[in-house]
């Protein structure tokens, strides 16, 4: 039996007419063109653009015009100062106040350069303290450190404070006259050698100048009386009587008790101080020689350089006066009136042990 049936394949193929605006490529192109446009324009121009190619051209022209307009607005905003955004960061200073200087708002740092603290200039310009202090010393004369700290001056030989000598005399302290009398004393000359950058001659000259400056207004000015009596060619009897009545008391304090002896001449006072209150150099030298020879004779039998494991540890030798002077010279804060404090401490320590 022969069966006649149709083929499994479609033989009468008729192509369906496809619209150009509904193809996938056309839809993709439409969505790419509408990106970045306002919502209203895409809805309005959607039908017209999809219907004809002229609508697509108009849509492209509209997009270009819109982009050009946005670029013009951005350029205007950059050029105009009113449209610049303001910073919202908090400011630490008010617009009417000056800006703080570096570091930490210290306004007086550059005034006292190279000293960051204005109080350091009083100590930095001391002779020999800093190599840069010579130029500052010649520029101006610095005030007294105690006056800058608003404290009573404790230096009896202070040239900047003329009332210090009278206050020291009232309080029972050492006055400038006593310091001028002891300027030639060996102990004072020894302490003067410890001062940083100040030789003995300049220290004695400083004492003499301070004594003359402080005692010029005082009632007991014996040096001026002697100088005027020597300078006058025809001295009057009143001047001779005043010269004879002038006496030189010894103000040396021993065990909290002043000497109290009175001399008519200054040479007698100086000799008395050297003989009674100053250690004789010959006796001290002889005692040092005897002790050194005794130590040498004792140590000759032993070997001090040999290490003994069972012996006691040897204590280090006490610092000599030269080493102490070098250490004090390295300290820039040592001032002339510290001599009185050091000497008074030594006297008080000896009194306590007695």
Swiss-Prot record:
Q: Where is the composition biased (Polar residues)?
A: 1-11, 81-90, 221-245, 294-305
GO cellular-component terms in the record?
A: nucleus
Which keywords does the record carry?
A: Developmental protein, Metal-binding, Neurogenesis, Nucleus, Transcription, Transcription regulation, Zinc, Zinc-finger
Low complexity bias (residue ranges): 43-54, 70-80, 278-293
Q: Which InterPro entries match?
A: Elbow/Noc_ZnFinger, Znf_C2H2_type
Q: Name one GO molecular function term.
A: zinc ion binding
The GO biological-process annotations, alphabetized, read as: nervous system development; positive regulation of transcription by RNA polymerase II
Where does it reside? Answer: Nucleus
Ranges where the record places region Disordered: 1-23, 36-100, 218-247, 271-323
Question: What PROSITE patterns does UniProt report for this protein, alphabetically?
Answer: ZINC_FINGER_C2H2_2
Q: Which family does it belong to?
A: Belongs to the Elbow/Noc family.
Q: What does this protein do?
A: Probable transcription factor that regulates development of the tail phasmid sensory organs. Involved in migration and differentiation of lateral neuroblasts. Involved in control of cell fate in the T cell lineage.
Q: What name does the UniProt record give this protein?
A: Zinc finger protein tlp-1
Record organism = Caenorhabditis elegans
Q: Give the gene symbol.
A: tlp-1
């Amino acid at each position: 039996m022969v069966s006649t049936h149709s083929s499994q394949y479609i033989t009468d193929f008729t192509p369906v007419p496809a619209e150009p605006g509904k193809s996938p490529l056309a839809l993709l192109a439409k969505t790419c063109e509408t990106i970045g446009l306002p919502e209203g324009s895409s809805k309005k121009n959607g039908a017209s653009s999809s219907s004809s190619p002229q609508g697509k051209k108009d849509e492209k022209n509209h997009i270009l015009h819109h982009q050009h307009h946005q670029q013009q607005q951005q350029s205007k905003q950059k050029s105009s100062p009113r449209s610049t955004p303001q910073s919202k960061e908090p400011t630490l200073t008010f617009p009417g106040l000056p800006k703080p200087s570096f570091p930490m708002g210290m306004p007086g740092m550059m005034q006292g350069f190279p000293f960051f603290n204005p109080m350091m200039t009083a100590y930095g310009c001391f002779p020999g303290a800093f190599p840069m202090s010579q130029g500052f010393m010649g520029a101006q004369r610095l005030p007294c450190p105690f006056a800058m700290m608003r404290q009573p001056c404790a230096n009896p030989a202070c040239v900047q404070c003329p009332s210090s000598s009278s206050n020291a005399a009232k309080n029972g302290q050492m006055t400038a006259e006593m310091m001028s009398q002891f300027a030639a004393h060996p102990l004072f000359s020894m302490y003067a050698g410890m001062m940083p950058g100040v030789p003995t001659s300049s220290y004695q000259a400083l004492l003499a100048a301070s004594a003359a400056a402080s005692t010029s207004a005082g009632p007991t000015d014996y040096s001026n009386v002697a100088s005027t009596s020597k300078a006058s060619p025809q001295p009057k009897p009143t001047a001779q009587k005043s010269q004879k009545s002038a006496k030189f008391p010894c103000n040396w304090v021993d065990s909290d008790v002043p000497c109290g002896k009175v001399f008519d001449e200054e040479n007698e006072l100086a000799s008395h101080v050297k003989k009674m209150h100053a250690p004789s150099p010959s006796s001290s030298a002889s005692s040092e020689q005897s002790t050194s020879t005794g130590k040498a004779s004792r140590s000759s039998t032993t070997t001090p350089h040999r290490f003994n494991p069972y012996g006691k540890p040897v204590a280090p030798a006490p610092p000599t006066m030269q080493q102490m002077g070098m250490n004090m010279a390295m300290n820039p804060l040592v001032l002339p009136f510290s001599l009185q404090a050091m000497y008074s401490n030594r006297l008080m320590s000896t009194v306590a042990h007695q």
